[in-house]
């Protein structure tokens, strides 16, 4: 399995088991993300802790996840970035657009805090 999906109560976590997320594998990730979205999943955490490299195709898949979540008023969080991957995210200024957390536990906390914030805004 290249991508492992774990459905939780409030979100789905997609873990990438690939060392490289490139043009060969990004379409499969995009397909999985679209499937989750069409299944009613609003909140997604992508865990890239095992991924050492990705290119523009990998970035595109990550942006698809962000767009799909936002399109249904959901939350997207990226976690487990290796230093080289984190550098690429910073260089491309995606760190200003995406919710990024260093660890899975922090990603879950961030997702829950964002959800509480949205719930409070909708009650106002």
Regions found by a protein language model. Give the residues of each.
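Residues that form or immediately flank small-molecule/cofactor binding pockets and catalytic motifs
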Residues: 10, 83, 105
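A charged, well-structured terminal subsegment
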Residues: 102-124
